[in-house]
Amino acid sequence: MRPAKRIGKLTTARVTAVTNDQGTNAKIVAAGTVPWRIKSGQLQVLLIHRPQYDDWSWPKGRLDPHETLPETAWRETKEEVGLRLTLGIPLGVIRYKTSNGNNRKEVWYWAARVIDQRPKPDANEVDETRWASVEEATKLLTKKLDKKPLKVLAEAYEAHHLATIPFIVLRQAKAIPAESWTKDEVDRPLADSGYTQAKAVAKLLRGWAPTRIVTSKYTRSLETIAPFVKKYGGAVRNKKWVNLRTVKAHPNFMAKRLRTEFKRHEPTLVCAQPSVTKRILKEIKSWVREDRHAVVNPKHVYTEKKSNLSPGSILVVHRATHLSGKIVSVERYEPYVN
C-alpha cells in the first residue's frame, strides 16, 4: 500500500486539557515520546543527540508499514534509547514542512514515564542522551517546534495531570455471524478477519501494557485478548458484570463494578461485546463530563457516530494518580489491519 494511502487509513482521536488531535493531515507522519522522570523531587526529561544532524531532540521516527501512531512512538523509543515505556498522556502534534519545502510532516508525541530504566543510545541514529530539567531542555533543544510538547508536559506536571494510569476498553474483534452459528452462543468464535484484528490489537495494546485484563467467558472475547496475553502476559479475570445478560438485567451493578475497576492502581483492560462496550462508553462519557475541566472537547471522541467502538478498536482513558483522580485524557484507535 502506498504510504499516503496507508496513513490516510489511520483512525486517531486524542483530547486532553490542552491538546485536541483529530486524524492525520500530512504526507509524512512520525511519532515519538518525551521520556520523563522525577529525580530528587524535580521533573526531568530525556533528550537525544543525533550525530547526523548534530541536534538535540526527542526519540521519534516515521511509521513502519502496518503500524499505528502509538505503536510507532513505542517502537522508536525502544530502538533509539533502549527504553520499554508505557505511553502516558498525549502531548500534541507538531507540524512543519520538510527541508525541501515540498512535503508537510507531522510528529505525534506522548509523555512516557521512566522508572528504574537506564537509556542506552543505539549508537547509530543516537550517540548521546541527557537528562535535563525543563529549563535546561528548553535551552538545549535545537528546534523551536520541539519545545511545544515540552511545554505541554510541563503544564501537565504543574496541574498534576502528568502521572497517570491507563484504563482501556476493547471491543471484541469481529465474530462469525450469529445466524450461521447453531451451537451455544457463549461458544461463538471469531471470524477469520477477527483473528487478524486480534493479532493487530495485541501490538497496539503493547504501548500501555495492561497487567489486569477483564473479560467475559464468551469465546470471542477470550480469543480477542489471547494474542496479547500469549506474547506480553497479564492476569485475565472472567467477570459476570461484563456479560451482556448481566448488563441488561443489572445495569447499575455493571456501572458500579466498572467504576471499581477504573479506580484500580494498575493498567487495566476491559474486553467486551459491542452492546456492552457501548454501555461502558456511555458511562465513561458521564465521568468525563464530571471532570470536564480536565479534558477539553470530549465531543471529538464521543459523538453519536462514535457512540461505540468498531470491532477490535480501543478507547484509552488516563486517570491522574494525584488525589483528585481526574480523567485527564481520552484517546481512541483502531488496530492497523491490511
Where in the sequence are the language-model features?
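Nudix hydrolase/Nudix homology domain
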Residues: R2, D54-D55, P119-P177
